[in-house]
């Protein structure tokens, strides 16, 4: 008799639990809980692409340096500034917390911009060495670096946009309630210089 009673109670208890979960899920959806999760994942995905493209550029620098060093007359100071800038980029510790830490994100961006400046100066100097520009190895690097710079621009733009959407969800009611429940707050972003939507021109 007791077993029969238990069998009757079990389905009722299951239905009660399911109904309770449904009642809990409804207000969570209403306060934008799911939107917070979605925007959070978009930020993480866009940041991963930013990291990937900057790393690709950094990986190309040693090849560029080696090709340029083949020209004995090339300005050493310009070449050394590129090597030093890349070293600083490599010295910046990047982990999952960087997208939530304004200081870390700025350190990362400053190091990358420093390398961008060093590479730009290098390319200006290369204009004085037509023999170097004419080599197959240099032309191959030209194509790779141009492509990477374009992808960096696109990745940065998407990251800035995804952070903007995330911050909107975090700050605007009622989704701000869901953000608070998940312990989420406003995230830092890259500076957006004029012409960010236009890839930098890399001339060789």
Model-derived segments and spans:
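A helix-centric hydrophobic-segment signal that preferentially recognizes long
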Residues: 2-204
């Amino acid at each position: 008799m007791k077993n029969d009673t238990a069998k009757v109670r079990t389905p009722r208890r299951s239905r009660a639990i399911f109904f309770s979960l449904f009642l809990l899920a409804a207000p969570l959806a209403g306060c934008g809980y799911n939107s917070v999760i979605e925007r959070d994942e978009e930020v993480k995905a866009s940041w991963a692409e930013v990291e990937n493209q900057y790393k690709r550029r950094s990986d190309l620098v040693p090849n560029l340096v080696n090709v340029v060093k083949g020209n004995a007359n090339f300005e050493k100071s310009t070449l050394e500034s590129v090597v030093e800038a890349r070293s600083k980029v490599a010295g910046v510790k990047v982990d999952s917390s960087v997208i939530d830490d304004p200081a870390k994100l700025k350190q990362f961006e400053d190091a990358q911009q420093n390398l961008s400046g060093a590479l730009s100066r290098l390319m200006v100097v290369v204009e004085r060495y037509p023999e170097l520009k004419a080599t197959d190895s240099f032309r191959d690097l030209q194509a790779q670096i141009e492509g990477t710079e374009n992808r960096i621009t696109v990745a940065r733009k998407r990251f800035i946009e995804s952070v903007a959407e995330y911050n909107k969800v975090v700050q605007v009611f009622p989704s701000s309630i869901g953000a608070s429940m998940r312990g989420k707050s406003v995230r830092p972003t890259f500076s957006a210089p004029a012409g960010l939507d236009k890839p930098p021109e890399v001339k060789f």
